[in-house]
């Protein structure tokens, strides 16, 4: 057990000297504003991306239960 702290120090050493570049954050408004149609398409794509797989799993839950019991 006495060897654990030196090993942990070796693992932590590279993290101390890592240089993280500055993020380029802009506080300006967008050059081309996003239209309502673009926002609707984007939001619906995200909703479909999350809900379709969840719905698939819920719709086939009984078959998953049967296959795992065998």
From Swiss-Prot:
The chain crosses the membrane at residues 39-60. One of its GO terms (cellular component) is mitochondrial inner membrane. This is Cytochrome c oxidase subunit 8B, mitochondrial. It comes from Mus musculus. Component of the cytochrome c oxidase (complex IV, CIV), a multisubunit enzyme composed of 14 subunits. The complex is composed of a catalytic core of 3 subunits MT-CO1, MT-CO2 and MT-CO3, encoded in the mitochondrial DNA, and 11 supernumerary subunits COX4I, COX5A, COX5B, COX6A, COX6B, COX6C, COX7A, COX7B, COX7C, COX8 and NDUFA4, which are encoded in the nuclear genome. Pathway: Energy metabolism; oxidative phosphorylation. Belongs to the cytochrome c oxidase VIII family. The keyword Oxidoreductase does not apply. It is found in: Mitochondrion inner membrane. Residues 1-24 form a transit peptide.
């Amino acid at each position: 057990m006495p060897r654990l702290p030196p090993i942990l120090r070796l693992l932590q050493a590279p993290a101390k000297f890592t240089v993280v570049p500055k993020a380029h954050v802009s506080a300006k408004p967008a050059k081309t504003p996003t239209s309502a149609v673009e926002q609707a398409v984007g939001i619906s794509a995200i909703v479909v991306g999350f809900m379709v797989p969840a719905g698939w799993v819920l719709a086939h839950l009984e078959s998953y239960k049967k296959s795992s019991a065998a």
